[in-house]
Amino acid sequence: MAASEAPPFWWEKPDWRAWALWPLSSAYGFAASARLRAAKREKIPAAVLCIGNLTVGGEGKTPIAIALARHAMRKGLTVGFLSRGYGGSHFKPHIVSPEDDSARAVGDEPLLLARQALTVISRDRAAGARRLVQAGCNLIIMDDGFQSARLHMDYALIVVDAMRGLGNGHVFPAGPMRAPLTEQMRFADGVVTMGEGDAADIVVRSASRAGRPVYSARIRPRSRNGLKGKRVLAFAGIGNPRKFYATLKACGADIVLERSFPDHHLFTEEDVSELSREAAKESLLLVTTEKDFVRLQNSMQPMRDFAASVQALKVEAVFDEPGAPDAIINAAQQAWRERMLKR
């Protein structure tokens, strides 16, 4: 379930709805914890760096994954991305083609990742990792999959939105947590808080008590975008569209209309026709996220035609600590080397 599809009370202080679901939440949390503890994860002959989160929905994992991949490639490593592929139709490991694959077939995030490095989607993450090793990758960056029980992770980096944090702190279905915090932190090697805010403080304290490093990062536009003073219709189908709108405003854009869709939304002809009409009526510039843009581009012809009239806001994740990417990648490689020596 995506954050934008989640019940609003998940992101508010706990109320009667959360407490009414507590029995189900407790059972789910117990099962999730047991699965994490009992997992028999396959170990492969390459370092595996997982970029995960503690809750459902978007926290900024993909920009962090791309930032670390770029740094690793500058170090001379051969990087491959591994993703489950949201809503994808492939049952076996599949190498993503950013030109030929559709968002419906492979998912939007894999299309973005494939523009940076070799990307494999696989419902069986261990099988997908083996495919990347066969292709010569010596560092596998797994976008999501922290709770997966199939693949051994040499380093698990948890991404937390500093503004939303853990929501009401309850485990699904009473809240957005995928498992209890203390249980998940047992398997984390580091934490990065995204953006400004203090909602992630509980995670920071938990990481500090466990002796895990904590980093901070933020999203910024990759280049000058010409949006200052422009009247725009901003639309997005991502986990947390408010972050996108806030970034647009920080660029100086005048957001006249906002249109939010569910996360990973596959736009229809009706959607794009309505957006075009609304923008034309007020003479507004259509602006969306990179994820939404690739979903439009890698779709049917009406959506591709519409994409030609849309500007994508290109962003990147930047660590506040200049040495953070190196520290994370080095830790993943060191853990892998130690693992290989024990074979």
Swiss-Prot record:
Catalysed reactions, as listed in the record: a lipid A disaccharide + ATP = a lipid IVA + ADP + H(+)
Source taxon at top rank: Bacteria
Q: Is Translocase tagged as a keyword?
A: no
Q: Which GO terms describe its biological process?
A: lipid A biosynthetic process; lipopolysaccharide core region biosynthetic process
The protein's annotated pathway: Glycolipid biosynthesis; lipid IV(A) biosynthesis; lipid IV(A) from (3R)-3-hydroxytetradecanoyl-[acyl-carrier-protein] and UDP-N-acetyl-alpha-D-glucosamine: step 6/6
Q: What is this protein called?
A: Tetraacyldisaccharide 4'-kinase
Keyword annotations from UniProtKB, A to Z: ATP-binding, Kinase, Lipid A biosynthesis, Lipid biosynthesis, Lipid metabolism, Nucleotide-binding, Transferase
Give GO cellular component annotations, separated by semicolons: plasma membrane
A single Pfam family, by name? LpxK
Gene name, Swiss-Prot/TrEMBL: lpxK
* Enzyme Commission no: 2.7.1.130
Query: What function is annotated for this protein?
Result: Transfers the gamma-phosphate of ATP to the 4'-position of a tetraacyldisaccharide 1-phosphate intermediate (termed DS-1-P) to form tetraacyldisaccharide 1,4'-bis-phosphate (lipid IVA).
- Listed binding positions for ATP are T55, V56, G57, G58, E59, G60, K61, T62
**Which molecular-function annotations from GO does this UniProt entry contain?**
ATP binding; tetraacyldisaccharide 4'-kinase activity
The cross-references to SUPFAM superfamilies, in alphabetical order and at most eight, read:
P-loop containing nucleoside triphosphate hydrolases
Q: Does the keyword Lipid biosynthesis apply?
A: yes
Belongs to which family? Belongs to the LpxK family.
Species name: Chelativorans sp. (strain BNC1)
